Regions:
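Conserved AMP-binding A3 loop
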Residues: 53-58, 188-215
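Conserved pre-ATP/AMP-binding loop-to-beta segment of ANL
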Residues: 38-41, 155, 160-161, 171-192, ...
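Conserved structural elements of the adenylate-forming
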Residues: 61-66, 171, 203-224, 244, ...
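Structural core segment of the AMP-binding/adenylate-forming
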Residues: 73-74, 97, 101-169, 182
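AMP-binding/adenylate-forming catalytic core of the ANL superfamily
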Residues: 113, 119-120, 130-133, 282, ...
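Conserved AMP-binding/adenylation subdomain of ANL enzymes
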Residues: 211-233, 237-280, 295
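Conserved ATP/PPi-binding loop(s) of AMP-dependent carboxylate-activating enzymes
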Residues: 362-365, 376-408, 446
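Gly/Ser/Thr-rich phosphate-binding loop
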Residues: 252, 279-284, 293-354, 367
Length: 476
C-alpha cells in the first residue's frame, strides 16, 4: 500500500513491499470480502437494454466455489492451464477466482481472436480446459480436432456439441471450497504477448503480480480507494490492462466493477454509460478516449461523476491531455508497462506528477531507467531503452516453455522493454518508439510474424511482410 504522503520523493523513500509468505489471488479478491462484508457489491452488470444486475461478494464467492468444484470434478489440478474466452460478465471473475483457488493457471484469451490465434495459444499453453460463451462455438469447432491437450470445454451460457453447460454443472456442485495454499511465486496466470520474431509468447505470472500492481493502482487512480469509487474500462478483461489495471485490483479493494459488453465499441454510448452508472474511475486506452472525444456532444459531460482516469498502451499525447483537463475537469494520468512488467511508470496529477507529452515518473516500489546497449544507465536527455530492475513483484516469472527468450529479455538485472525513451532532468520519462517491428494499434501490440503466417497459409500468397502504417486515431 502507498504511504499517505503528498510528496512524491518522500513517498518513494517511504515505500516498502510487504509480500506475505503465502498469497492467493482468489481469496484476496473475493473470500476475505465475502467473510467480512458479504452483501458488498462486487460486480454491476448492465445491458444496452437498460437492465442492471448487482452481484455481491457473497454471490461471487459461492459461484466461484461451484466453478472450482466443477473444474476439480473434471480433473483440473494444481498447475493445470485453464483458458478463458469470456466477455465482461459476472462469470469472468468467478472463473478467474475459481482457477486461482484451485492453484491452476488462468490463460485469458481475447474475444477478438480468430481460430488461428486461439489454436496456437490453446496448444502452446497445454490448456486442459476452456471456459467460453456459446457465440465462440463456431471458432472452436473449426479447430477442435487440432487441440492436442484440451479435454473439456465449458460454456457459461448454454451448451453445444462437445460443450458442457457450466452453469448446469456448477448447480450440482457445492458452494464451499477450500482454496489451495499458494505462494507468491506460484504460477497464477499466463497472458500472451506478441514480439517481433516468432509466435506469441506466454508471459507467466505468479500470484504476487496482483500485489505488484497495488501501488500503481493507488497512484494512477489518485489514492484509491475513496468513498463511492466505482471502476470501469472498455478494454477486454483478457488483456493485462483490463484484468490487472481494473478487474482484479478493484475487487481487491472491495470496490464494484462495471461489466458491460460492447460487441463493437460505441464511443457515444460510452458517455451515456458513464453518466447512467456513476462510474468514478476509468481506464480508457488512448484510441477509445480519442473516439469518445470525437463523439462528445454539447452536454456530454452532464451527469458524469468521474474522479480519475488512467490511460496507456500507446501515447496519450498533449492534445488529449489538455482536452480532458479543460472539458472533463479530470487530468488523464498516463501509465506505462508491458504484459511482462506492468504499471511501472505513470502520472499522478493529485500530487503534481503530471506533464502533458510525458508518461510520468517511476511508480513507488519500482526502479526504472533508460539504459544503453551495454546495460549502463543513460544520463538525462540521452536516448536508450526503457528498462525495469529485478527483483520486482510485478515482473513475470518467465516465458512459458521459452527459456532462451526469457534470458534475452534481460541485460543483467534489467528487463528490456524494447521501447525507446528518455528521462529529463526532472525525472519525467517520455516514450518515442520501438526498437523492433511490433505494431501498436489501438493499444494492442501485434507481432508481424503471426499475421504473416496467416497470410502465407493462403494458397495464393507465396511471401508476405507486415509493417505498421501510421494512423492518427489508432497509432498504427
Amino acid at each position: 500500500m502507498l504511504p499517505e504522503l503528498n510528496d512524491y520523493s518522500a513517498m518513494r523513500r517511504a515505500f516498502r513491499w510487504q509480500i506475505p509468505a503465502q498469497f492467493n489471488i482468489g481469496t484476496a479478491v473475493c473470500t476475505r470480502w465475502a467473510q467480512t462484508d458479504p452483501q458488498r457489491t462486487a460486480i454491476v452488470s448492465k445491458t444496452r437494454q437498460g437492465s442492471t444486475h448487482n452481484v455481491s461478494f457473497d454471490q461471487l464467492e459461492r459461484l466461484s466455489n461451484q466453478f472450482a468444484n466443477t473444474l476439480a470434478a473434471h480433473g483440473v489440478r494444481r498447475g493445470d492451464r485453464v483458458a478463458l474466452l469470456l466477455p465482461q460478465s459476472m462469470e469472468t471473475p468467478a472463473a478467474h477466482i475459481a482457477i486461482y483457488k484451485l492453484g491452476a493457471v488462468a490463460v485469458p484469451l481475447a474475444m477478438l481472436f480468430g481460430p488461428d490465434a486461439l489454436e496456437y495459444r490453446l496448444n502452446n499453453s497445454d490448456a486442459v480446459a476452456l471456459i467460453m460463451t456459446t457465440d465462440s462455438s463456431g471458432k472452436l469447432a473449426s479447430i477442435r480436432d487440432r487441440l492436442t491437450t484440451l479435454r473439456f470445454v465449458f460454456a457459461t451460457d448454454g451448451t453445444g456439441p462437445d460443450i458442457l453447460d457450466l452453469q448446469n454443472e456448477a448447480g450440482k456442485a457445492s458452494d464451499r471450497f477450500c482454496a489451495e495454499d499458494t505462494f507468491p511465486d506460484d504460477p497464477a496466470m499466463m497472458i500472451y504477448t506478441s514480439g517481433t520474431t516468432g509466435p506469441p509468447k506466454g508471459a507467466l505470472h505468479g500470484h504476487k503480480v496482483l500485489l505488484g500492481h497495488i501501488p500503481g493502482i493507488q497512484f494512477g487512480y489518485e489514492f484509491l480507494p475513496q468513498p463511492d469509487d466505482f471502476m470501469w474500462t472498455p478494454s477486454d478483461w483478457a488483456w493485462a490492462g483490463g484484468l490487472l489495471n481494473v478487474l482484479l485490483p478493484s475487487l481487491y479493494f472491495g470496490l464494484p466493477v462495471l461489466a458491460y459488453r460492447f460487441d463493437k465499441f460505441d464511443p457515444e454510448y460510452a458517455w451515456t454509460l458513464l453518466a447512467e452508472t456513476g462510474v468514478r474511475n476509468a481506464f480508457i486506452p488512448p484510441t477509445a478516449l480519442k473516439m469518445m472525444r470525437a463523439a462528445a456532444g454539447d452536454d456530454f459531460a452532464k451527469g458524469l461523476k468521474l474522479r480519475s482516469i488512467i490511460s496507456g498502451g500507446e501515447a496519450v499525447g498533449r492534445q488529449l491531455q489538455e482536452w480532458s483537463k479543460d472539458q472533463l475537469g479530470v487530468r488523464v494520468n498516463e501509465i506505462y508497462g508491458q504484459t511482462e512488467c506492468n504499471l511501472v511508470l505513470q502520472s499522478c496529477a493529485a500530487i503534481g506528477i503530471w506533464r502533458p507529452g510525458a508518461i510520468g515518473k517511476p511508480t513507488p516500489g519500482h526502479e526504472v531507467a533508460v539504459i544503453g546497449k551495454d546495460g549502463a544507465v543513460m544520463a538525462p536527455g540521452e536516448a536508450g531503452t526503457i528498462a525495469i530492475k529485478r527483483p520486482d513483484p510485478v515482473m513475470f516469472l518467465g516465458y512459458w516453455k521459452n527459456e532462451q527468450a526469457t534470458r534475452d529479455k534481460f541485460i543483467g538485472d534489467w528487463l528490456l522493454t524494447g521501447d525507446q525513451g528518455i528521462v529529463d532532468d526532472d525525472g519525467y520519462f517520455s516514450f518515442f518508439g520501438r526498437d523492433d517491428d511490433v505494431i501498436t494499434s489501438a493499444g494492442f501490440r501485434i507481432g508481424p510474424t503471426e499475421i504473416e503466417d496467416c497470410l502465407i497459409s493462403h494458397p495464393a500468397v507465396k511471401l508476405a511482410a507486415v509493417i505498421g502504417k501510421p494512423d492518427e486515431l489508432r497509432t498504427e
